Swiss-Prot record:
It is found in: Cell membrane. GO terms for molecular function: sugar transmembrane transporter activity. Pfam families: PQ-loop (PF04193). This is Uncharacterized protein MJ0110. GO terms for cellular component: plasma membrane. The chain crosses the membrane at residues 9-29, 40-60, 66-86.
Length: 93
């Protein structure tokens, strides 16, 4: 049996990307419904969003489509969360 390692590795990348990207969706939905971001750390949100951005840049530089696609999708979830968290923190002060 011949296994195409490039294909297998790409499939693993897409599965991992799907799981990690959509893992944040319930948090986004909950936060938007409740209009409450107090259960999320500002430091975490900023660090995580920065990390996603750096992963996207890395994926672009390496021309790695799973990394590019899933970090764009993740940023689509986390940029609004970041905005809402910063807005809520500014309202508190």
């Amino acid at each position: 049996m011949v296994i195409n390692m490039d294909f297998d590795i790409t499939v693993i990348g897409y599965i991992a990307g799907t799981l990690t990207t959509f893992a944040s969706l319930p948090q986004l939905i909950k936060s938007l419904k409740e209009k409450d971001m107090s259960n999320i750390s500002l430091a975490f949100v900023i660090t995580f969003t920065t990390g996603l951005t750096l992963w996207l840049i890395y994926g672009i530089l390496r021309n790695d489509y799973p990394i590019i696609v899933f970090n764009i999708l993740s940023l689509m979830f986390w940029i609004p969360i970041t905005y809402l968290k910063i807005r809520d923190e500014m309202r508190k002060s």
